[in-house]
Design a protein with these regions (language model features):
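Conserved catalytic core of the tyrosine transesterase superfamily
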Residues: 1-267
Length: 267
């Protein structure tokens, strides 16, 4: 049945990693709890709540619920846990640190990584989306991405980045195809980017907690709102289904909150 479930998911618009996660979850549940019934499902939920963060718990429960839908057992579906939203953004690279990292990468001749960081912070691209950028997209100034629901999201490449990236591509003789490649000439992986970011954070004495791929997407959103306060437009640029998701960028980071309190509160 799990194999049939996997084949069913593969025909949907779910990302490959999501399919893998759902199948792994169902297999784990069946191996450890056996029969699918309310008692076992609640026991599994209890195990998740005790051992994982709410977001992870809900991801696992989503996989279980998808399986219950597939096996026509919707009545057994498990409720998600409530995720307490923090009133500040966590682990977002500061604008100063972003500029510092860019400058160091440029000075040390890490041109490809200089552009990886710049592209992420200047386009708001997810790391998986970044890998789809080709030389042809630099020429036209944008990349069209297709979301799970079949919607098109346009990733715009700002003029100053286009100009410098085009110059770099001419220097390395790359006229077409994917621009971010590993030493074997193959597309770099998301894991490779994450690993290299950790290396650079250590090399330049930066906080590893803020030097990770999604941090630069957060920085794009924060910088955009600081300079052009249009939440609806930002939601479109980020590819958010709901503007409520984008509202988090109206919040300050924890360090920003601390600085404001230190400056304002003198009584």
């Amino acid at each position: 049945m799990v194999t049939k479930f996997k084949n069913h998911l593969a025909k949907t618009n779910l990302a490959k990693n999501t399919v893998t996660s759902y199948v792994w979850t169902v297999q784990y549940f069946l191996n450890h709890y056996g029969e699918v019934n309310k008692k076992n499902l609640l026991a599994y939920k209890g195990y998740l709540v005790e051992n994982f963060k709410p977001q992870t718990v809900n991801l696992r429960l989503q996989g279980i619920n998808k399986y219950l839908e597939f096996t026509k057992q919707e009545k057994l579906k498990v409720k998600f846990v409530k995720v307490q939203q923090k009133n500040f953004l966590e682990n977002v690279i500061s604008d100063a640190d972003y500029k510092f990292l860019k400058a160091q990468l440029k000075a040390d001749g890490y041109d490809e990584w200089y552009f990886i960081v710049w592209f992420m912070a200047a386009t708001g691209a997810r790391v998986s989306e970044l890998l789809h950028i080709k030389a042809e997209h630099i020429q036209i100034g944008h990349l069209d991405l297709y979301s799970k629901g079949g919607k098109i999201r346009r990733l715009y490449i700002p003029k100053n980045l286009r100009t410098e990236a085009a110059k770099w591509l001419r220097e390395i003789g790359l006229t077409s195809g994917y621009i971010f490649l590993n030493r074997f000439g193959q597309r770099i992986t998301t894991r490779g980017i994450t690993s290299q970011f950790k290396h650079f954070a250590e090399k330049y004495g930066m906080n590893k907690e803020v030097v990770y791929p999604h941090s630069f997407r957060h920085r794009f959103a924060k910088n955009f709102l600081d300079r052009f306060n249009d939440l609806a437009l930002l939601a479109d640029l980020m590819g958010h289904e709901s503007i409520e998701t984008t509202r988090i960028y109206l919040r300050r980071t924890a360090s920003e909150q601390q600085k404001i309190v230190d400056k304002v509160v003198n009584w």
